[in-house]
């Protein structure tokens, strides 16, 4: 992709998942404007290639390339890793942005409720939306396989290339306000996920299996799981936990997670209140952290916050 070995070493390269629209596309645009070569990925090849063409054309940004990626498909993830290895020889920035809501929604019914943003953010909308948002078992499986296992799949495949970064690797996991432990009704689950010294992927994945079993048996509320966007909320809570495990395991990298803000995007059925440009600021800041920047932290937009 580039001429000399020296050029390769100096060039910063980023991979962004789920980047054909919304926050992901805006993160790609902003990083490219900072001189980073961006590998924009998307599950849909036509939409992803179209997003790259729009950046190159109307935005006059040449340093963006497309590669197809389905975070739920091992072979697709492997193909991306091989592409980055052969084209760039290393990776400096990984932004795990691909996500799924895990919910079946009656969009018109949701619109008719006219729920204000404050009700969404505070959790007061939980009881209002139960009739229009439906959590299915299959939806939860897809949600976990995308938001947690998909992130893990991509990260593990790209870690060898991130370890070769000459500028210091950055991993940014795009999370959600719904991830915050204070929103988890179960005290025992909160305590388990707060015990950072003993937190492991095995424990995290055990929690996901428990959730699925409780969902199947119809006892989510009784066992203390969140009832607002249940699988989505839990997937982002464990994504934060995985971020802390990664940061501890790879001290030479800066690994953080971030709630981008209540952005108006497809994943929240366009109920958000801030623009994608605003929402991308936190992830971009973390992707470009200086060498002495924080790691193993959670950010609410650009401000460090409590898990």
Label for each model-derived stretch:
Residues 100, 106-144, 163-248, 259, ...:
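Catalytic loop of short-chain dehydrogenase/reductase
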Residues 64-66, 255:
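Hydrophobic/aromatic anchor residues within beta-strands of the central parallel beta-sheet
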Residues 2-42:
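Canonical Rossmann dinucleotide-binding motif of NAD(H)/NADP(H)-dependent dehydrogenases/reductases
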Residues 95, 154-158, 162, 239-243, ...:
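Hydrophobic positions on the long internal alpha-helix
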Residues 27, 73, 139, 150, ...:
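Conserved cofactor-binding/catalytic machinery of classical short-chain dehydrogenase/reductase
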Residues 15-16, 39, 92-95, 172:
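N-terminal Rossmann-like NAD(P) cofactor-binding module of classical short-chain dehydrogenase/reductase
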Residues 45-46, 68-82, 137, 148-151:
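The beta1-alpha1 cofactor-binding region of Rossmann-like NAD(H)/NADP(H)-dependent oxidoreductases
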Residues 153, 237, 257-265, 269-307:
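C-terminal helical subdomain
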């Amino acid at each position: 992709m580039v001429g000399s070995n020296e050029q390769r070493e100096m060039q910063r390269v980023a991979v962004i998942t789920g980047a054909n629209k919304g926050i992901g596309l805006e993160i790609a645009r902003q990083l490219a404007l900072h001189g980073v070569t961006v590998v924009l990925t998307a599950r849909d090849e036509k939409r992803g290639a179209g997003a790259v063409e729009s950046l190159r054309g109307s935005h006059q940004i040449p340093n963006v390339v497309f590669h197809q990626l389905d975070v739920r498909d091992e072979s697709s993830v492997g193909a991306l890793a091989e592409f980055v290895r052969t084209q760039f020889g290393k990776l400096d920035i990984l932004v795990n942005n691909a996500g799924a809501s895990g919910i079946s929604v009656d969009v018109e019914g949701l619109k008719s409720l006219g729920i204000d943003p404050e009700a969404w953010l505070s959790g007061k909308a939980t009881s209002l939306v139960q009739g229009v948002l439906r959590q299915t078992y299959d939806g939860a499986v897809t949600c976990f396989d995308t938001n947690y296992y998909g992130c893990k799949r991509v990260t593990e495949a790209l870690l060898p290339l991130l370890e070769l970064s000459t500028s210091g690797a950055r991993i940014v996991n795009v999370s959600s306000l719904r991830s915050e432990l204070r929103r988890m009704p179960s005290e025992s689950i909160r305590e388990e996920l707060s015990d950072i010294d003993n937190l492991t992927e095995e424990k995290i994945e055990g929690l996901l299996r428990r959730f699925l079993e409780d969902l199947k048996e119809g006892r989510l509320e009784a066992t203390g799981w969140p009832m607002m966007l249940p699988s989505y909320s839990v997937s982002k809570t464990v994504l934060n936990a995985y971020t802390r495990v990664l940061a501890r395991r790879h001290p030479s990298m800066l690994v953080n997670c971030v709630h981008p803000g209540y952005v108006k995007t497809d994943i929240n059925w366009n109920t958000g209140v801030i623009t994608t440009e605003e929402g991308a600021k936190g992830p971009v800041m973390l992707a470009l952290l200086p060498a002495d920047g924080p790691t193993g932290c959670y950010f609410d937009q650009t401000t460090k916050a409590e898990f």
